Curated annotation (Swiss-Prot):
Cell location: Cytoplasm
A GO CC annotation given for this chain: cytoplasm
Source species taxonomy: Bacteria, Pseudomonadati, Pseudomonadota, Gammaproteobacteria, Enterobacterales
Gene: cueR
Protein name: HTH-type transcriptional regulator CueR
SUPFAM superfamilies (UniProt xref): Putative DNA-binding domain (SSF46955)
Source species: Escherichia coli O157:H7
Amino acid sequence: MNISDVAKITGLTSKAIRFYEEKGLVTPPMRSENGYRTYTQQHLNELTLLRQARQVGFNLEESGELVNLFNDPQRHSADVKRRTLEKVAEIERHIEELQSMRNQLLALANACPGDDSADCPIIENLSGCCHHRAG
């Protein structure tokens, strides 16, 4: 298979595939006599794993580690599960941070009259001001 075939099958761009190769995240493809990359089912599996790992929140390094585990016949599912649960905990922390930000923004928006006056509790709060501007 050539790179355009692999791109269609995996849903990745040719540029992304080359990037993953440059970063050493996938097994290097063989080269044909004319210098074109030749891909196998193994490459499809690795690239699909990378794409899907990225979609569920794993960063590049973590995704590469998952590819390494995929290629390791001696891997332990406990390692994969541990990494997955660590990612879940990280996502949960991020959700809590986002919810806190959302609540803070809603409180600011509720404190703002949203009228034609220059007084804006949102700006005052975010700028650290504690007094209204003198008129």
